[in-house]
Amino acid sequence: MKILFVLISILYAVYCFSSEEDVDSAYLANELEPVEDINSEQYAALEPKEEQERSCADMGQDRKDDCDCCLNIATCNCWFGRYFCSCTFGDYQTCLRKKGKCKRNRPQSCPRSNLNRKKG
């Protein structure tokens, strides 16, 4: 049984190597036809466009001012004074401050927390 398995393995290996040589020789002789991409027209419109810089930054991205952060309650938090600034979560007061000073990315409305309301 082991001998039969070894013989079949050897025959298969010889077959694989001989078929690779046929394909390689045909490729080198340019006998193979080029493969046409069927979906080439479909993806022609999906070519990547040049990326434009956003006017605001998401949480964690580097920015220099509160007005550069996207969310209404986002604030620009800087370490060591003015270095390593990034957008982090702020509060209602942050939103009011942005509403007064920002000309771009100005908040339309400031969300109020439901924690301070009395129930009952």
UniProtKB/Swiss-Prot annotation:
Predominant cellular place of this UniProt entry's protein: secreted
Q: Where in the cell is the protein located?
A: Secreted
- Residue positions assigned to the propeptide: 17-54
Query: Which first-to-last residue range defines the signal peptide?
Result: 1-16
Q: Does the keyword Disulfide bond apply?
A: yes
Q: What tissue specificity does the UniProt entry give?
A: Expressed by the venom gland.
Q: How is it modified after translation?
A: Contains 5 disulfide bonds.
In what residue span(s) does the Agouti domain sit?
Answer: 56-95
> Which key words tag this protein in UniProt?
Disulfide bond, Secreted, Signal, Toxin
Disulfide cysteine pairs (residue numbers): 56-70, 69-87, 78-85
Give the family, as the similarity comment puts it.
Belongs to the neurotoxin 05 (agouti) family.
In Swiss-Prot or TrEMBL terms, this protein is called U13-lycotoxin-Ls1c
State the species of origin: Lycosa singoriensis (Wolf spider)
